Amino acid sequence: MAADLKPRDEDLDLFGLTHQGLVRSENQDHFLIGTLHRELAVHGTSLPMSQLLLRGERFATFGVVADGVGGTAGGAAASRRAVETIAQYVQSTLRCFSVANPDHEAAFVEALRGAALEAHAAVRAMGGDAEDYGPATTLTMAIGIWPRAYVLQVGDSRCYVYGDGALRRLTRDQTVAQDFVDSGALKAEDVARSPYRNVLSSAIGGRSADPVVSALNQRRDNVVLLCSDGLTRHVTDEELGVALASIRSAEQVCQDLLRLALERGGTDNITIIVGRARHPMS
């Protein structure tokens, strides 16, 4: 069936944006959307180059969001370095996992964790001898190798997927407040008022980074959302689900969600990525 076939490049609907918000003095967020292809390098030919400059088969699609930790020196530089490092790692290392063979999935998951730790080391190196107060950032990446998808997370930038009429959050906030909830010391409904809601328990470049990887099957018309907490502090999960359910295009959803967050104060930097694989006729 066509629904089970790997989506063509023209079936992909991908869009991302970032906004400083209405309060912060700078934007410390960064994002990247990319596809990895097999390509031909031509070193000499008598043929017209227009016949040869064709990308090979796409074997992976990915999106990354990084939110530089506010209040630390170099938060913007940290998020940029994290995104650059993980993109380079993906390009140079993950090609060997171009087929998500179940027998190789454990090794692939470890490679993703290795990518996060590589970014952690790169950002830590920016801080010199600083033990506690160097630059830091969140990092959340979704990477699809059809028909599987993987979500890598450090920090509290989130990943959601909407499908079959329901929204699922695929990440757990790595914050002190969430740790309190998990231990029973704090009620989930009290997190928004907790002074620890934005205190990261794990961060790229922080004291420690604890990369978490989850895996799922991809389906056409599932909608994936990656975002920094500048969106989710103003827009509820229920509202996210409504927006993704009514998608006309990835760009439209990103713009609608950004507008809603800004209307409600835009108190932090806001970064949003939306992606889906459409059915060929949609």
Question: Language-model segments: which ranges?
Answer:
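PP2C/PPM-type serine/threonine phosphatase catalytic domain
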Residues: 1-282
